[in-house]
Amino acid sequence: MAKEIFYSDDARNRLYEGVRKLNDAVKVTMGPRGRNVLIQKSFGAPSITKDGVSVAKEVELKDTIENMGASLVREVASKTNDQAGDGTTTATVLAHAIFKEGLRNVTAGANPIEVKRGMDKEVAALIDELKNIAKKVSGSKEIAQIATISANSDESIGKLIADAMEKVGKDGVITVEEAKSIEDELNVVEGMQFDRGYLSPYFITNAEKMQVELSNPFILLFDKKITNLKDLLPVLEQIQKTGKPLLIVAEDIEGEALATLVVNKLRGVLNISAVKAPGFGDRRKAMLEDIAILTGGEVISEELGRTLESATLEDLGQASSVVIDKDNTTIVNGAGEKSAIDARINQIKAQIAETTSDYDKEKLQERLAKLSGGVAVIKVGAATETEMKEKKDRVDDALSATRAAVEEGIVVGGGSALILASKRVKLDLSGDEAIGAEIVRRALRAPLRQIAENAGFDAGVVTNAVEVSSDVNYGFNAVSGEYVNMFEAGIIDPVKVERVALQNAVSVASLLLTTEATISELKEDKPMPAMPDMGGMGGMGGMM
């Protein structure tokens, strides 16, 4: 396949055209007065979204060089979304502004490598300044404000997320699901819940609710199958003497062992129930260990030289209550020591930081939530499926932004924080490095300009008003059209979102600026196929 090569200004200009087209599609969604983008789907109804990364992912350009530029900035949006959960439109708008401003200077003769070095120094100083002016999130009111802004000024979503975080804590898992009605709902499951139900309906104690309810039970944890009753007898005899209920969590319980447990339950000899251990393979072992730490027990494991026959009451965990239905088991108020639980939580956090797999990260976060004290489920309601999907995207964004705010703190929102931080950064640079720093400073106005423009205000006037103000909390409220104290007005952004958006935007823009050649496949115009031979149509000779 023949290749097409472009050099220097020709290459960069065509890359810029792709970046511009992507930016033009994404930037209209920015701010509280941002517009919707309608996206055609290969099947079904088109989707409507105000989510920057959803728009960016759909942009594929016909020209291969332009598409290379667009795909690099598309990666900026996607990476920002993965790292911070929000700020995708900010990152796209910044990347375009930096590339546009940089291209003008490089075309005029500036050295792109020196320009890049100056840009990197300016960004490092800006990030330090953002951290200096950041405030810690102090309560559910600020959490609600952050979530509201990220959900495109939907206060009901902000309140839902604030309530969810208040109930399960900042490390708790909050999941988003589609509701079966048009109303939004918040359901909270306290304690540790895992997706395994009772092994036999004969264990049920509450026939009305069809669930097993155990009060102050002992909890036996075993990492293998239990088939032989003889292995279980010693611990069952000890349990019977205490008169307390027993929950057995094992890989499986079958045959003679399960039948005997059911008979003893029905005869009232033992108040007992059994469930399969959650997860598979190594994850099952880890989750059994989590349950052991939460309940103050030990996992009876043959790998550690322990047999089921050797189990004593000291090896068993305890909890204030256990509720089991056909699908789930919930352990409430485990008797484990707080120091041991905290150590386990820190261990899982370290694993989350190290893993590169999204799947592993998700499963580790689920384990973290179960240990931290609960799971909240936000059920999003809407009148139509299209509206439901759009709203669910906004809730996901708001949830990610809220977590980012709790993690690194908050700064003034509405595109003002980057401008205010840049006024406080004074670097002693010269030559093309100084040009690089100035390119970044100029580009930092772009998010505020776009927010004002989308809201129907004069972008130049708004940007200038914020730039000349000496008040670090000063900014523009695009909803009311007023200049306000942004913290008092509740217009705030997570530092992490601003930081990640800026870092990723500068990273890709500087790569584009230092590009000196592009190589792409040359699209060949294929000739039209020849008309087929019509010789077989002799029977039509009578036509005039």
From Swiss-Prot:
Alphabetized Pfam families for the sequence: Cpn60_TCP1
Question: What is catalyzed by this enzyme?
Answer: ATP + H2O + a folded polypeptide = ADP + phosphate + an unfolded polypeptide
InterPro entries registered for this protein in UniProt? Chaperonin_Cpn60_CS, Cpn60/GroEL, Cpn60/GroEL/TCP-1, GroEL-like_apical_dom_sf, GROEL-like_equatorial_sf, TCP-1-like_intermed_sf
Q: Where in the cell is it found?
A: Cytoplasm
> What are the GO cellular component annotations?
cytoplasm
Specify which residues bind ATP according to the UniProt entry for this protein. 29-32, 50, 86-90, 414, 477-479, 493
Q: What is its EC number?
A: 5.6.1.7
Q: Does the keyword Nucleotide-binding apply?
A: yes
Keyword Cell membrane appears in the UniProt entry: no
- Purpose: Together with its co-chaperonin GroES, plays an essential role in assisting protein folding. The GroEL-GroES system forms a nano-cage that allows encapsulation of the non-native substrate proteins and provides a physical environment optimized to promote and accelerate protein folding.
Name it. Chaperonin GroEL
In its UniProt entry, the species of origin is given as Campylobacter curvus (strain 525.92)
Q: What is the lineage of its organism?
A: Bacteria, Pseudomonadati, Campylobacterota, Epsilonproteobacteria, Campylobacterales
